[in-house]
Every structure is written in C-alpha cells, then in structure tokens.
Amino acid sequence: MQKLIVSFVIFTTPLAAQAAGFGLAEQSGSGLGNAYAGAAAIAEDASTIYSNPAGMTYVLGTQAVGALHLINPNAEFNDDGSVRAAPRPLGKEGGNAGNLAFVPNMYFKTDINDSVKFGIGVNAPFGLKTEYDKNWLGRFQGIKSELKTININPALAFKVNDQLSLGFGVSVMYAKAELTSAVNIGAAERSSKVEGDDFGFGFNFGAIYQITPDTRIGASYRSKVEQKLEGKAKSNFTALNLIPTRTLNTDVTADLTLPENISVSAFSRLNDKWDLLGDVTWTRWSQFEELRIVRDNGTNSTLISTPENWDNTMRYSVAVNYHYSDTLKLRAGLAYDEGAASTAFRTVRIPDNDRKWLSFGAGWQVTPSTKFDIGYAHLFISDTDIDDNQLAPVAPSPVGKGRVKGEYDASVDILSMQVTHNF
C-alpha cells in the first residue's frame, strides 16, 4: 500500500487546482466533455464512485475505468507597482507559474447481488503547484507551493426500488505539501523549505431518484478531511549566525482541512439523440482561514502565519450529449466556477479566481465491452488582481517581504482520455 501511495503521489503533479481553491475537478475522463455537468446523476461509468456512489446501481456488471488528464496551465504575473523588500533588489516578474501536469484516476465496480454493488476508486481530489523563478519579485512571499493528495475510496450502493438508489463510501486520503521561499535578513538573502505529510479520513454518500424513465436527479455529499501535516523546516542560515539554527531547522506541524461539498445534479434523455445535464455544487472553502505552520520543538511558536479568509464557492454547469450513432456520443458543456480567494487576501501561492469552462468530448464504443472517451476543456480565468503588502514595519525593523502588486493573466487547457472495460 505504501508503495502504491508513493508512486501515485509522484505521478500526480497537479498545477494550480482546476476547480476553486486547490480542488481538482478532473475525476473522470468521460465527464470532462460535459464540464462535469450532471456528475451526481448521469452514472455513466464506475467513476460515479467519486461523484455519487449511488450511481453504481446504473453501471452494469463488473467494470474497470482508467483515466489520465493532461493539464496545461498558464499564469503570468504582470507587475504594477510592486515594492522591493529593503535592502534587497526588487527582482523580475517571475515567468509562468504554471507547470504541465498529469493527473490519473482509477475505478473498479462489481455486483454483490442484484441490489447491492461494490466499488473502489483511487484519485486525487485536491492538488496545487505554483512555482516562480527563484529571483522573482515575490520570492519572499513564495517561490514554490505544492500540495499532492491521493484518495482511496471504497463504496457500496443499494438499489432500494426501481426509482431510488443510495450509496455510501469512506475515504482514506494522503496529503503531502511543500512550501519554499526566500528569506530577507537584511544583510543577505537565504532560502527556506517547509514540507510535511499526513493521512486523513472522510466519507461520502449520495442518492439518485428516477423521476421518469428518461429523467433522474442525484445529490451527493463529500465530508471534509482534517489532517495534521508533520514534517521539517529547513534553511541555509547557519553560515551567517544571525538567527539561532534551532528556530529555522526544526520539526513543524500544520493543520489542513480539505473541505466538504454538496452537489445536486440532473440528467434527462430528451429523445433518441439528445441528453440534457446540469449541476450545482457548493464547497465550504471558508474553513481555510489561515496558513499557519508551527514549530514542533517544544516551543509551539509560529513559523509562518498567512491570513487566507477564503469564501465558500458555488459551481454551476450545464451540458448536452448528442448520440451520433449507437457507438459514438458527442459531448459539450459550460461551467462557471467561483474562486475562493478575494483580492484583499489573495496570495502568490494560490492566486485563485473565477473560471469559465468551455468543454467538448466524445465517447466511442470500440467493442461491446470496451469504450474510449476523450475530452477537452479550456478555462477562461478572470483577470486576477493581487496586492500582497508585507513591507517591514517602521524602523528599527530592518527586514520585510516587500509588496507584490499587479495582475495575473491566466488560463488552463485540459485534455482527458479514459478507457472503460466491462468484464
């Protein structure tokens, strides 16, 4: 199990999350073409284990699903009045903070009997990576910020009757985080790195109700996962002897709450050719009030404290499917995804903002037992203002982190591929 987790985390290197905050929406390849509209109701394949486990009652027989998402983000910072951290030079704009990323998911579902279904999913519900040039003007606020997760999610589904299905699952989630930055000590610059990891536990449940033979609605809930990341803080201050090494090279802890969400979806087969899908999802990002890292060396003093004060978010999506033939289905979708960070508290580590999704995709039934899905989405991200003022207080304090003031030009392209096989 440990080898599986390490391999998955190394392979899963998401950039800035493609849903609000540091959430990852890419949990199935078939759903991307619909911008994940109707995810809690469509129950198209075993990836429903994540979006709504009740949907397993709609998936026939034993099925395995494997998906891979290629995420290509762009996030260019444009300076508009930043101020250096005296006495250090200002530095450059930082280049593209985005990084090409690959995100996989895997699902397996089978029948226990006609009414009870079992499945298990392995995916990455949250992730973040921003990385700037080491000499950029915001280096004292952050250079590299990375969060990786892996979620193992066994689930059961029950067909209560011809109209109602229920599902329940549990989650074992591993999280690993790394933060790096430059440190201004007046006489020179030095670097610091903080990293830690932990396991956390949560659950999910959902229901699907078949209103008519062609129309159903679904609702699902995923719980928060609370973790206490434990790790190390490291720096290269020793040569200057300006700050006691024990305060900078030390064990650290940080509380991390990965938020709960609620989704309500609808799916309707309008006629032999067209399907209509919709979804509304609420996520409780307001729990992310502060990024606080504490020394675990007996002092319990604060090493890093950054106010975040995020807002809860809504995501709205709508989509259509066109059944071109018995073996080919075409998809299109739109979504509006609210950002969790406001301008007043936006940081260089997570320059989050609202997103608009435009998605296309197709599903091809290659053989009676094997299906291939492909999807593409472009995310239009609103112009993202930032004014992170961490200038030093009035003398005699000789140090500070400077002021990062400007705007991000950002967008994301996502390509997903999925293979589904029935045994």
Language-model features and meaning:
Residues 23-38, 57-76:
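Transmembrane beta-strand segments of Gram-negative outer membrane beta-barrel proteins
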Residues 12-16, 68, 362:
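Residue-level signal for alpha-helical transmembrane segments in multi-pass membrane proteins
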Residues 1-19:
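Gram-negative bacterial Sec-dependent N-terminal signal peptides
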Residues 39-44, 49-62, 108-113, 160:
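Outer-membrane beta-barrel pore proteins
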Residues 9, 59, 286:
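Active-site-proximal flexible loops/turns
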Residues 20-35, 39, 83-93, 100-423:
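Outer-membrane beta-barrel porins/channels
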